[in-house]
Amino acid sequence: MLRHLPSRLPVKMWGRTLEKQSWRDSSQTPPPCLIRRLDHIVMTVKSIKDTTMFYSKILGMEVMTFKEDRKALCFGDQKFNLHEVGKEFEPKAAHPVPGSLDICLITEVPLEEMIQHLKACDVPIEEGPVPRTGAKGPIMSIYFRDPDRNLIEVSNYISS
C-alpha cells in the first residue's frame, strides 16, 4: 500500500536542504543545471534497414546492434536508438511517429563538401547554406530530410 508523503518533504541537494516545490511555481529560483550532456535520442522509423543505410552512407554513422537485435546509429559520444513504428520498446514516447524529428548535427566537414556529397548521393537540399544560431554561437547550416522525412540540419560553427 502506498503512503502519502507530506507535501513539504525536505530534500538534500547541492549541499543544502530544499523544500519540496512544484515545477509550476515560477516564484522559485531555478537550481543549477543538473544535465551534463545528451546521451541518446530515440528515433521512431518506418524501416530500420532504410534508416541505417541512409545514416551510415550519407552521414557516416556507425550502425551498432545491442540487446539482441536492437539497432543504434553512433556518432561522437552520442547515438540514435532506433524503434520501428509499431514495434517500439517500453517505455516509449507518448506519441512515437516517424518524421517528427527536427535535429541539428555539427560537422567539421566544410559545408560545401557536404553539399557536393549530398548531391552525389541524390539527397535534395531543402535549404541552405543559411546562417543560424547554435548552442555555442553562430553556425552555417544546410537542411535535408531522411527517409522518414525527419528534418536534418547539418552545420559548421562560424569562427570569429
Swiss-Prot record:
Origin superkingdom: Eukaryota
UniProt domain VOC: residue ranges: 37-157
SUPFAM superfamilies according to UniProt: Glyoxalase/Bleomycin resistance protein/Dihydroxybiphenyl dioxygenase
Coiled coil: none
Gene3D superfamilies noted in UniProt: 2,3-Dihydroxybiphenyl 1,2-Dioxygenase, domain 1
CDD domains in alphabetical order: GLOD5
Similarity comment: Belongs to the glyoxalase I family.
The protein's name: Glyoxalase domain-containing protein 5
Organism: Homo sapiens (Human)
Gene: GLOD5
